[in-house]
C-alpha cells in the first residue's frame, strides 16, 4: 500500500469510530425530578452525521454550564457540539409529567416541539406539555 492508500484507510477508520461514538450518545439525559434549565445540543461526528440531544441538570445554574459540561464529554468522544437554544423543564415522575418552556438568555429559545419529540423517546408514557410562556 502506498501512503495515500494508508491515509485513506486511516481516515475511514476514524470516521467509522466517530459514527459509532455518535450512535452511542443518549438522546436524553435530564435530572430525575424538579424544575431545571435545559439545552438542546446538536452533536456532529467527523462527517455529515448529526443528532439533536436534550440535556438538563438541576445542579447547573446557567444554560452554559450544562452545555460546557456536555461539550467536554462529546470532545472526548471525538464529536463536535453546538447549542441552538435552551429553556426549562419541569419533571414530575410521580405524575409522569414533563413541561418544556422558557428560553436561555445566552443561547435563545430551543425548539420546544422538537424537544418534546426527543423527550418522548425516553418518556413515552409521560404527558409532555410545551409552552412559550415564562422564563
Swiss-Prot record:
Keyword annotations from UniProtKB, A to Z: Differentiation, Sexual differentiation
Tissue: Somatic and germline cells. Isoform B is expressed in both sexes and in somatic and germ line cells. Isoform A is expressed in males and is germ line specific.
Residues reported to bind substrate: 37, 104-106
Active site (record annotation): 63
GO terms, molecular function: protein histidine phosphatase activity
Keyword hit for Ion transport: no
InterPro entries tied to this protein: Janus, Janus_sf
GO biological process: cell differentiation; sex differentiation
Domain of life: Eukaryota
GO CC terms, sorted: cytosol
Signal sequence range: none
Family of this protein: Belongs to the janus family.
PANTHER family: BCDNA.GH02250-RELATED (PTHR12258:SF5), JANUS-A/JANUS-B (PTHR12258)
Additional remark text: Transcription of janA gives rise to two sex-specific and one non-sex-specific transcripts.
Biological role: JanA and janB regulate somatic sex differentiation.
This protein's name: Sex-regulated protein janus-A
Species the sequence originates in: Drosophila melanogaster (Fruit fly)
